[in-house]
Amino acid sequence: MSLNALRNLLGLLTVSLLVGCAAPKTVDYSAYKQARPKSILVLPPLNESPDVKATYSMLSQVTFPLAEAGYYVMPIAVVDETFRHNGLTTPADIHGLPPAKLNEIFGADAGLYITVKEYGTSYMLISSQTVVTASASLVDLKTGTTLWTGSARASSEEGNNSNNGGLVGMLITAAVKQIINTSTDAGHPIAGITSQRLLSAGQRTGLLYGPRSPKYGTD
């Protein structure tokens, strides 16, 4: 190998190492720490999936991780009834309301805007999996400032690499799973996992601990 070729190879290896050692994603928490919201209003999630159950399935799952993180969460049923009483029945219309108006109506410090991007079971040639993917933004309802954004995904096939039974067995298993999953809304428990990953505090890019948590202010 010539000297020039060796230099080129070393250069490529150096670039590869630099790419592989790229800095992990970071989040700017300065506005979040300045606002320090105590209460959160969860808006009905926007649904970009074809499954109509996605909005309320996800909505019913988010209170727990938020409460565990140390926030007061406005009661979901009361919020839903208030929107309906005022003629607001679709997530798109609700998401379009000015943040200051939401603060005026509910008195919450921040609003959580969620979008469900994937929800439900998909059938492929030799597998069938249930996936829920969602993104979220936490917005200061007094100023309209975005305090935090995040996303998460969960799948029923995580860690499942078994292929016992051959091709025919895999096809039958996938078909049976598809029937069971679509008839029982298998997306609901997966949405719970997604919401935990999305909204649990203490993660590197997750929500900060709220004032009701003993870990408040440690992050």
Model-derived regions, located:
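Post-signal peptide N-terminal segment of mature Sec-exported envelope proteins
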Residues: 30-53
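Bacterial N-terminal signal peptides that target proteins for export
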Residues: 1-10
